[in-house]
From Swiss-Prot:
Pathway: One-carbon metabolism; tetrahydrofolate interconversion. The keyword Lipid metabolism does not apply. It comes from Pseudothermotoga lettingae (strain ATCC BAA-301 / DSM 14385 / NBRC 107922 / TMO) (Thermotoga lettingae). This is Formate--tetrahydrofolate ligase. NCBIfam families: PRK13505.1.
Length: 553
């Protein structure tokens, strides 16, 4: 089989304006970025009936460190839906440069299930992430300038919660001291960087309905606390208008295409632990108004991205998911059955019998939201027929549809069975979130911990209790909860693979994201600034005299 980049370069792309024309998007709402990429004005959304299409959410079982192929599945499913006569659009998050140059490489699908032009999407794209980083750091700069010139807002230097941001993996920037070198440079204090995808600005961009909503949300950001314990907002700094100006183009969804010319909206890229982990609401709603089926993807497993999509994104955007596709692999099932990473290519039926309990939990979790489930079993060359049969038979006995997905190797042809099974259940959804937003914070977390993470109880640290009291005092405790925890276990401990239960779920602290509109409950150590490995993917990336890029895949 050809490499991903060889497959991508052999594809025959349609001019992006043709893709837009086929979707009936008027030229007045388009801004072309070269021949194969364009931005669609967010104002076009006002012309659409967003109830037209059905929304398909692609999630996964608890992944291995390598991931299980959600993006490839999402792209393949959308192409297959088009192949069998339905208009479909896939909506995805934008790749971050940090992982591109780090361990992961490119993030535009793979094999015969890719979004293109791959090099452009992975490297800068249309500049959205750069705009987010610039907006984020303008706030940081104004905070320290405000303090330097009198600190009229009486900001407590020890309680500034707004870090700086950069779209790169750089562990040396996690914890730093700024403003060294004398009084002219400001007041020295501890600070740090997060990767841009973890910025609250990114979450706001993906949750905003329009520029005015974005401006209001930015103004509501709490950047820290005053010496008398009151929240200090961006609105008090007076720069929400400037931030909106920086993001005026970034708020517009990006239009590209798959390897088979299926339309793809790629817009925004918030983390699925510290934030909600799905592409922009504007892109999803626009796609719903232009197609029969919209395929969108949530980050990590169903305990993280899907739960947040159901409990937070859907109510916030008035979305009604029709189907959830849970991506599973034989290797991930064996991994949760106790098989080391180095041995995952070896047949092991006993490990599958044990590890499939993890998949069962994810199926049960999604069904608690009254959304029908289809399992997409991504097929790998090392999977044996006995292993595949065991997984299929076990899932079918649960009363859940399952499809062998071969979109990576066969494109849309490899996902037609999956598409048909999704359509079969698409009218059965009776979607409902699992908790009410106006419930107490502790109650919301206990529901998630016991129902989704399978804990027996919840423990709050002293720091968490203090932080929550501060949030309650500010009158912001009625916001929904985003739980930041490990993606490698349904529990709060990454070493607990499979189907752990009966444990105490620990909440270490709370973080207020009032601009985005949620409270983050932090469990365990959450890495917001990754580091590069000993041999990062950057050493594989190169460009020749003709401009051909190598090493992204």
């Amino acid at each position: 089989m050809l490499s991903d980049i060889e497959i991508a370069r052999s594809a025959k792309l349609e001019p992006v304006m043709n893709i837009a024309k086929n979707l009936s998007i008027p030229g007045d709402f388009l801004n072309s970025y070269g021949k194969f990429m364009a931005k669609i004005s967010h104002s076009f959304l006002k012309n659409l009936n967003i109830r037209k299409g059905k929304l398909i959410l692609v999630t996964a079982m608890t992944p291995t460190p390598a991931g299980e192929g959600k993006t490839t599945t999402s792209i393949g499913l959308s192409m297959a839906l088009n192949k069998i006569g339905h208009r479909s659009i896939v909506t995805l998050r934008e790749p971050s440069l940090g992982p591109v140059f780090g361990i992961k490489g490119g993030a535009a699908g793979g094999g015969y299930s890719q979004v293109l032009p791959m090099e452009d999407i992975n490297l800068h794209f249309t500049g959205d992430i750069h705009a987010v980083g610039t907006a984020h750091n303008l706030i940081s700069a104004v905070i320290d300038s405000h303090i330097r010139f009198g600190n009229d807002l009486d900001i407590d230097l020890t309680k500034i919660t707004w870090p700086r941001a950069i779209d790169m993996n750089d562990r040396a920037l996690r914890n730093i001291v700024i403003a060294l070198g004398g009084h002219a440079n400001g007041y020295p204090r501890e600070d740090g960087f997060v990767i841009t995808a973890a910025s609250e600005i990114m979450a706001i961009l993906c949750l905003s309905k329009d520029l005015q909503d974005l401006k209001n949300r930015v103004g509501n950001i709490v950047i820290g606390w005053s010496k008398n314990g009151k929240p200090v907002t961006v609105h008090e700094l007076g720069i929400e208008g400037a931030i909106a100006v920086i993001l005026k183009d970034a708020i517009n969804p990006n239009l590209v295409q798959t390897i088979e010319n299926t339309p793809a909206f790629i817009h925004g890229g918030p983390f699925a632990n510290i934030a909600h982990g799905t592409n922009s609401i504007i892109a999803t709603k626009m796609a719903l108004g232009l197609s029969d089926y919209v395929v969108t993807e949530s980050g990590f497993g169903s305990d993280l991205g899907a739960e947040k999509f159901f409990d937070f994104v859907s109510p916030a955007a008035d979305l009604k998911p029709s189907v959830a596709v849970i991506v599973a692999t034989v290797r991930a099932i064996k991994y949760h059955g106790g098989v080391p990473l180095k041995d995952l290519e070896n047949e092991n039926l006993e490990a599958i019998k044990k590890g499939i309990e993890n998949l069962k939990i994810h199926i049960e979790n999604v069904k608690k939201f009254n959304v029908p489930v289809v399992v997409a079993l991504n097929r790998f060359a090392t999977d044996t027929e006995r292993e595949l049969d065991l997984v299929v038979n076990t899932v079918e006995k649960l009363g859940t549809k399952i499809s062998l997905n071969e979109a990576f190797a066969k494109g849309s042809e490899g996902a037609i069975d999956l598409a048909k099974k999704v359509i079969e259940v698409a009218d059965e959804s009776k979607f409902s979130p699992i908790y009410k937003w106006d419930s107490p914070v502790e109650e919301k977390i206990k529901i998630l911990a016991t129902e989704i993470y399978r804990a027996k109880d919840v423990s709050f640290s002293k720091e968490a209790i203090t932080s929550l009291k501060q949030i309650e005092k500010a009158g912001l405790s009625n916001l929904p909860v985003i739980v930041a925890k490990t993606q490698y276990s349904i529990s709060d401990d990454p070493s607990k693979l499979g189907a752990p239960d009966g444990y105490v779920f620990n909440v270490r602290n709370f973080k207020l994201s009032s601009g985005a509109g949620f409270i983050v409950a932090i469990s365990g150590e959450i890495m917001l600034m990754p580091g590069l490995g000993k041999k990062p993917n950057a050493v594989n990336i190169d460009i020749d005299e003709k401009g051909n890029i190598t090493g992204l895949f």
